[in-house]
UniProtKB/Swiss-Prot annotation:
Cysteine disulfide links: none
Organism encoding this protein: Xylella fastidiosa (strain 9a5c)
Protein's recorded name: UPF0250 protein XF_1271
Alphabetical list of InterPro entries matching this protein: UPF0250_YbeD-like (IPR007454), YbeD-like_sf (IPR027471)
UniProt cross-references to NCBIfam families, sorted A to Z: PRK00907.1 (NF002066)
């Protein structure tokens, strides 16, 4: 069964600008490595919307990256690249 919406504002719209967050171990250069990996997988990064924040204990870092994806395949590939990194604990 396929679910479709009559309203275009529902769900993902492609092409579009999206944001992914990844949390991983601090001190592993994830702040620079994760954007580089996304760029390599073919998505266009929104450079001014890349940010990171360290946890209160300093043990973890959350990296937030905005990017443009042409289609769902490109979006899914970007998400997978982040998930595949050995230092990434989880993604949103």
């Amino acid at each position: 069964m396929e679910i479709k919406s009559d309203h275009s504002e529902h769900g993902f719209q492609f092409p579009g600008t999206f944001e992914l967050s990844a949390v991983g171990t601090a001190g592993k250069a994830l702040e620079t490595e994760l954007p580089r990996l996304l760029a390599r997988c073919g998505v266009e990064l929104v450079q001014e919307r890349i940010s990171w924040k360290h946890s209160s204990t300093g043990k973890y870092v959350s990296v937030r990256i905005s990017f443009r994806a042409l289609d769902r395949e490109q979006y899914d590939a970007a998400h997978q690249v982040l998930r595949d990194h050995p230092e990434v604990k989880w993604t949103l």
